[in-house]
């Protein structure tokens, strides 16, 4: 495994660890998710370029589309929660409350 792949896997692991450890605020969770998606995008792009697999060349672009949709939904949820509750604490979000 080359140094580039190890750095990308380290970035993904650090983002995943940040998501698991610092999940008290919704904004920090969204930033960690974006870091994970960026690492997945770079890993998919490098894998496709190195293997010369031209049939899967659209896969990183599709991944970016889903990442943009995820970011838009996450930010709209952040705005809705901060307007409703005044904070962005994840502990305040309970689906069992009316």
UniProtKB/Swiss-Prot annotation:
Membrane-spanning ranges: 1-21, 29-49, 61-81
GO CC term, one of those recorded: mitochondrial inner membrane
Uppermost EC category: translocase
Coiled-coil residues: none
Reactions catalysed according to its record: a ubiquinone + NADH + 5 H(+)(in) = a ubiquinol + NAD(+) + 4 H(+)(out)
One MF annotation (Gene Ontology) recorded for this entry: NADH dehydrogenase (ubiquinone) activity
Topology of this chain in the membrane: Multi-pass membrane protein
Subcellular location: Mitochondrion inner membrane
EC number(s) per entry: 7.1.1.2
Quaternary context: Core subunit of respiratory chain NADH dehydrogenase (Complex I) which is composed of 45 different subunits.
Role, per record: Core subunit of the mitochondrial membrane respiratory chain NADH dehydrogenase (Complex I) which catalyzes electron transfer from NADH through the respiratory chain, using ubiquinone as an electron acceptor. Part of the enzyme membrane arm which is embedded in the lipid bilayer and involved in proton translocation.
Record protein name field: NADH-ubiquinone oxidoreductase chain 4L
Organism of provenance: Elaphodus cephalophus
Gene: MT-ND4L
């Amino acid at each position: 495994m080359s140094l580039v792949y190890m750095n990308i896997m380290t970035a993904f692991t650090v983002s995943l660890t940040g998501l698991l450890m610092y999940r008290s605020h919704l904004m920090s969770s969204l930033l960690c998710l974006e870091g994970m998606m960026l690492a997945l995008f770079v890993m998919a792009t490098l894998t496709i370029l190195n293997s010369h697999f031209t049939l899967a060349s659209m896969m990183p672009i599709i991944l970016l589309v889903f990442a943009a949709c995820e970011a838009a939904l996450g930010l709209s949820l952040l705005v809705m929660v901060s307007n409703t509750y005044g904070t962005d604490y994840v502990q305040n979000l309970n689906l069992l409350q009316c």
